[in-house]
Curated annotation (Swiss-Prot):
Keywords, comma-separated and alphabetical: Cell membrane, Membrane, Transmembrane, Transmembrane helix
Descriptive protein name: Uncharacterized protein AF_1482
Record bears the keyword Cell membrane: yes
UniProt lineage: Archaea, Methanobacteriati, Methanobacteriota, Archaeoglobi, Archaeoglobales
Annotated source species: Archaeoglobus fulgidus (strain ATCC 49558 / DSM 4304 / JCM 9628 / NBRC 100126 / VC-16)
Membrane topology (UniProt): Multi-pass membrane protein
Membrane-spanning segments: 12-34, 49-71
GO cellular component, one term: plasma membrane
Main localization (coarse): membrane
Localization terms from the record: Cell membrane
Amino acid sequence: MDTSELERRAKICLSVVTFSTSYSLDAGVVVLAFLGIQRFRRSSKGAKIPEFLWVTWQSFIKVLSLLNGFVQHQKRYIFIRVCIY
């Protein structure tokens, strides 16, 4: 996977995570992780990112987006409950 593809995916992930302002800290973590991967690529002279690292990165993003979705869902649920009662 080339750098441009990785950057594109990272931007998509960042936009998903930063969609909720309550997860700005997680967005920071994503940026740090992305910069870490970029640094690894530079230090290994453009070597391919190990598969396990890429899978871990994707899992990390999935967990963040699931958490984010869950929190948003809970907020909506509480809001609806408050409106009804």
